Amino acid sequence: MLIIETLPLLRQQIRRLRMEGKRVALVPTMGNLHDGHMKLVDEAKAHADVVVVSIFVNPMQFDRPEDLARYPRTLQEDCEKLNKRKVDLVFAPSVKEIYPNGTETHTYVDVPGLSTMLEGASRPGHFRGVSTIVSKLFNLVQPDIACFGEKDFQQLALIRKMVADMGFDIEIVGVPIMRAKDGLALSSRNGYLTAEQRKIAPGLYKVLSSIADKLQAGERDLDEIIAIAGQELNEKGFRSDDIQIRDADTLLEVSENSKRAVILVAAWLGDARLIDNKLVELA
């Protein structure tokens, strides 16, 4: 496995792979890798000859400096996991390598609408940071496919739209959420939970599933469903942050024409803001 930290060396390797006619898959990450990331890697390996994993804690997508400062940097452990998975290339640049003149004056990519609604409304600038770094990685790695987790549902929708709008010739593969046995979605943020909070955390998925059951049973008073779910989260020890039921294909309000809904839940548990989602077919 090759570990690359600079843009010139990355470009050199990508040119070589292209000359050899290799099909390249990209898995963009911020490191602190867990089994959910390994599922993305496995999916990438199934679709391509060569897998490139990027590890970069992107300052542009953090709306709170304290979150950026405390985000775990575990490059050595991450590379050991990726080596066992037989990843071909790890791109782990410094912030200076990606943003040589800082982030304030750096050219950015914005996806209107999707970047400021829902999760974007509570995290100003977050999705602009995501779309900027992902577009830069697409330009550098020139992958044939790129794999993203469905846990970050809005992010996946945003990337798909950016790819369509910008004309990137890249197949975007969404990989289903990987869960612990008790239902908790795997996430780097779970590492912020205390042992006691970890016992409470599966309650998020239980509330999510309860909403899904109501929708599948034909209930359509969404305001009431959301209000009850928020109360249930608070009773379980969470601080409910945002609960949305949206059209899964547009992320707009559910309408009579909606065929699928996505339930999007965000809640604080101690210092960890946990997110999860679930798709529901509407009869």
Curated annotation (Swiss-Prot):
Pathway: Cofactor biosynthesis; (R)-pantothenate biosynthesis; (R)-pantothenate from (R)-pantoate and beta-alanine: step 1/1. Its EC number is 6.3.2.1. Beta-alanine binds at residue 61. It catalyses: (R)-pantoate + beta-alanine + ATP = (R)-pantothenate + AMP + diphosphate + H(+). GO terms for molecular function: ATP binding; pantoate-beta-alanine ligase activity. It comes from the Bacteria. The reaction proceeds by a bi uni uni bi ping pong mechanism. Catalyzes the condensation of pantoate with beta-alanine in an ATP-dependent reaction via a pantoyl-adenylate intermediate. HAMAP family: PanC. Homodimer. Belongs to the pantothenate synthetase family. This is Pantothenate synthetase. It comes from Escherichia coli O45:K1 (strain S88 / ExPEC).
